[in-house]
């Protein structure tokens, strides 16, 4: 699990050719890693949707990332339920 800082740190990241200053309790390395993943996702989606403007591309990226997150949350709930069911069977 990643280590969180006690104080907010600012760092500059690059996403799709734009520089952004972000602040958070996570390390600058972690924030840059997150930004790099967003950048990669935007570039991946650009290949499939070459005519989207940057704003629409960013929204499409956000929708895709949220979809991934929701599916992972659902899978975690499923695994937790399986673990609980397994614990009941072993009791």
UniProtKB/Swiss-Prot annotation:
Compartment(s) where it occurs, according to its Swiss-Prot or TrEMBL record: Cytoplasm
Coiled coil: 62-82
The keyword Lipoprotein appears for this protein: no
Keywords from the UniProt entry: Cell cycle, Cell division, Coiled coil, Cytoplasm, Septation
Highest taxon listed in the record's lineage: Bacteria
Keyword Cell cycle: yes
GO biological process: division septum assembly; FtsZ-dependent cytokinesis; septin ring assembly
Chief location of this protein within or outside the cell: cytoplasm
InterPro entries: Bac_CellDiv_Activator, Cell_div_ZapA-like, Cell_div_ZapA-like_sf
GO cellular component, one term: cytosol
Function description: Activator of cell division through the inhibition of FtsZ GTPase activity, therefore promoting FtsZ assembly into bundles of protofilaments necessary for the formation of the division Z ring. It is recruited early at mid-cell but it is not essential for cell division.
Record text on subunit structure and interactions: Homodimer. Interacts with FtsZ.
Listed PANTHER family: CELL DIVISION PROTEIN ZAPA
Recorded family membership: Belongs to the ZapA family. Type 2 subfamily.
Protein name in UniProt: Cell division protein ZapA
Species this chain originates from: Halalkalibacterium halodurans (strain ATCC BAA-125 / DSM 18197 / FERM 7344 / JCM 9153 / C-125) (Bacillus halodurans)
Phylogenetic lineage: Bacteria, Bacillati, Bacillota, Bacilli, Bacillales
